[in-house]
Amino acid sequence: MDAWRGMPRWGLLLLLWGSCTFGLPTETTTFKRISLKRMPSIRESLKERGVDMARLGPERMALVNITSSVILTNYMDTQYYGEIGIGTPPQTFKVVFDTGSSNVWVPSSKCSRLYTACVYHKLFDASDSSSYKHNGTELTLRYSTGTVSGFLSQDVITVGGITVTQTFGEVTEMPALPFMLAEFDGVVGMGFSEQAIGKVTPLFDNIISQGLLKEDVFSFYYNRDSENSQSLGGQIVLGGSDPQHYEGNFHYINLIRTGLWQIPMKGVSVGSSTLLCEDGCLALVDTGASYISGSTSSIEKLMEALGAKKRLFDYVVKCNEGPTLPDISFHLGGKEYTLTSADYVFQESYSSKKLCTLAIHAMDIPPPTGPTWALGATFIRKFYTEFDRGNNRIGFALAR
């Protein structure tokens, strides 16, 4: 989803399949499984094409020192996408499901071909939908990697076999970088109404209002072994969680406040020593982000402890040193959630140098949301995550 409407943190991205369903709640409509697909991130696509990100310039690819008071999302590293249908008959779009933002948007057929990103993506054509209703209110969404703008429209959206009437953004202006290389078309915000631009009711709120779910929760599973493009990248469950993908019971942490998927954190340990956040800090849980991020000062201290070297936008170690790096533990709700080096180090197979990138970034988020850590797919792959709207809390269980 930055930032943090997450890090567009993102991700992170899901594949939603299903037919339209209406009616009163039943056993078949209270629990919806949604398959996820994994893709190369925009950053990976750039590197695979031999693009030197340093040459793009910090003004084009800035990922740090965000001055906005809202959470911004950086979709450079988003890896998971899903599908939704918009209109009648449904027009299908690949989207990021992002707990760091609250609006739904897709590219519009009214987007000028002068915007290269629109040429490479599926466009929503209102004239092809019999259920479309005009709104026209202007919409602008700022992300750390650029601004998208357009206007609001209303139509039916089908997600996970559930169909709701939804106000969403038709984007008519979107920057070539990073969106030209993105495999996803748009974004579905899974955040709260307090974050929604234009006072739009978020999609999940509309689903809740239909009374079709057993519980007012949704959960995320990201497959740690999904490098094969044909394998299941992960899963979202609307209305519950899937015991096939986690072990034991959930451990819940209450949100800092209603309106943001942010929880208190009591420390970050490297090995057996608590190195950071000794006096307490905050952590966003961001499905739109692929990496874990913290403030620049915190990440610099962490990287020094790991012996990692900084590149323009990331940190690297020699690959043969990766297995020897210490565990990193996050202290949440009285428990320690530990990542081994195998969880936060990955090798760039397309790099000629034997360097491995750490799935940890620096990100400075200003008040009132920040300073804050953000726990993205690096964390969620290890810990199955349940977002409980009914009780304003987040639950974690060991993924399997």
Curated annotation (Swiss-Prot):
Keywords: Aspartyl protease, Disulfide bond, Glycoprotein, Hydrolase, Membrane, Protease, Secreted, Signal, Zymogen. GO terms for molecular function: aspartic-type endopeptidase activity; signaling receptor binding. Residues 80-397 form the Peptidase A1 domain. It catalyses: Cleavage of Leu-|-Xaa bond in angiotensinogen to generate angiotensin I. Interaction with ATP6AP2 results in a 5-fold increased efficiency in angiotensinogen processing. One of its GO terms (cellular component) is apical part of cell. Its main location: secreted. The active site is at 98, 286. One of its GO terms (biological process) is drinking behavior. Its EC number is 3.4.23.15. Residues 24-60 form a propeptide. The keyword Ribonucleoprotein does not apply. Disulfide bonds join 111-118, 277-281, 319-356. It holds the Pfam family A1_Propeptide. InterPro entries: Aspartic_peptidase_A1 (IPR001461), Aspartic_peptidase_AS (IPR001969), Aspartic_peptidase_N (IPR012848), PEPTIDASE_A1 (IPR033121), Peptidase_aspartic_dom_sf (IPR021109), Renin-like_dom (IPR034135). Residues 1-23 form the signal peptide. Glycans are attached at residues 65, 135. It comes from the Eukaryota. It is found in: Secreted; Membrane. Interacts with ATP6AP2. Renin is a highly specific endopeptidase, whose only known function is to generate angiotensin I from angiotensinogen in the plasma, initiating a cascade of reactions that produce an elevation of blood pressure and increased sodium retention by the kidney. Belongs to the peptidase A1 family. This is Renin.
